[in-house]
Amino acid sequence: MAPSNLPPIFNATSQDMEMMLTAQCHLGSKNMQTHMEPYLWKTRPDGVNVINIGKTWEKIVLAARIIAAIDNPADICVISARPYGQRAVLKFAAHTGAVAIAGRFTPGSFTNYITRSFKEPRLIVVTDPRTDAQAIKEASYVNIPVIALCDADSPTEFVDVAIPTNNKGRHAIGLVWWMLAREVLRLRGTLASRETEWDIVVDLYFYRDPEAEETKEIEEAKAAEAEEAAPDTLNPADNWDAAGAVAPATFGGTPAAGNWEASGADWATAAPAGGESWAADAPAATEPKW
């Protein structure tokens, strides 16, 4: 990594660098655009261009200083047509006061004042110059500065500040937007000092698949129902006691042999109780007296 050209107070910490490496912000595409060559560190044997994350950090700080220089946060428009960046721009707008356009950009939003979505921002920040090309093109018509997250193969035409990073991975996109929001809040004074940790975790900026979330909720609900039904199936005796029936007797061990032979009697030869024989003669019939 090349030495930083920033003042010492803006230098990145080792934790910031580790986070960018973990989120794979340094992995660019195999194709390369000529204007992005100064931001590349080297090319791997498999053809993947590796981005210099030191340059990435410098551009994040530069972009944050430009954003913080605008008095009214509502004059900043953050845009992402790429699904992986839509959650990030919404969170960025919520934390910094900017206006978010997540999803399809309506043509004419910057040039046609008749449309309901017409806006006149002083600055726009886009996730990908390729997917957000319509917004960049209209911004060039009305002289709006553009900040963009650019990969190794991203077109840089009409882009004023390019932040070199991997703009195709959901973790890389979310992390760069999170770092940009944190630097803006630091420059505005919302965070007391650079040593103060931001209480917003970076996970909130990561893309989440709605279908995966619904599937997870359904599985959790089924697991909860199974846990509730488990005691009834495993302990049927509890239901019998609830109905007022007597629970079956249980034995702690094998009964002693002496208990069975205590009487010493033979069941085969024992006489019936009462001294009567089952083979006794029937009583004689008596004649009725009229």
Swiss-Prot record:
The keyword Ribonucleoprotein applies. GO terms for biological process: ribosomal small subunit assembly; translation. It comes from the Eukaryota. GO terms for cellular component: cytosolic small ribosomal subunit. The keyword tRNA-binding does not apply. Its main location: cytoplasm. It is found in: Cytoplasm. Keywords: Cytoplasm, Ribonucleoprotein, Ribosomal protein. One of its GO terms (molecular function) is structural constituent of ribosome. Residues 252-290 are annotated as: Disordered. Component of the small ribosomal subunit. Mature ribosomes consist of a small (40S) and a large (60S) subunit. The 40S subunit contains about 33 different proteins and 1 molecule of RNA (18S). The 60S subunit contains about 49 different proteins and 3 molecules of RNA (25S, 5.8S and 5S). Interacts with RPS21. Required for the assembly and/or stability of the 40S ribosomal subunit. Required for the processing of the 20S rRNA-precursor to mature 18S rRNA in a late step of the maturation of 40S ribosomal subunits. PANTHER family: 40S RIBOSOMAL PROTEIN SA. Belongs to the universal ribosomal protein uS2 family. This is Small ribosomal subunit protein uS2. It comes from Arthroderma otae (strain ATCC MYA-4605 / CBS 113480). The lineage of its organism: Eukaryota, Fungi, Dikarya, Ascomycota, Pezizomycotina. The gene is RPS0.
